[in-house]
């Protein structure tokens, strides 16, 4: 009925072994069952579930045991939604969220508290802006994409032209295009393109506090760990 690490699991818990450095905990685990590969099965004192990819198998089991909350629909009384915005009836707009003119919010989208969806932004079906997320510059967010708290999409890239000893701002005219099934961690920023768009393709996973500068192209299924900076 629960999932737990090898060393902390007790009766009723499912655990897993995917990293050899934790193998020492296998012989003393009290889990009811362990997901592991065939090479480790003989060392387990408890029933095993064999898998070529124990970590992925554990992840799927955890999703079944801890399902996400059912999506809500409607608009919180404190939200501000421009009358030209298109909000699907099956979407949820949370407390103090702002949806600006001509934005398009698709079916089952969840917009959390304090989010800002700028003018002309499009957010695809089933995507989630968790809390205090800002999406600007007519950005396009695909389907089933998650933006964690504090993410900023579409802020200006760093464009400055040196003119006779001072700096002049270079207008940032592009946007941001984010594909389906993308996950972007807390306080990550993705700048709009200077002329062409900044692009994050399908299935990309980005950790917390990453900076993606203007005109960056991130290919499908890329994974990026925390605190990385990617120059434009």
Question: Where on the chain are the PLM-derived regions?
Answer:
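Terminal amphipathic alpha-helical/low-complexity segments used for targeting or macromolecular assembly
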Residues: 1-78, 126, 139, 144, ...
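Structural signal for interior beta-strand "rungs" in well-ordered beta-sheet cores
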Residues: 16, 74-232
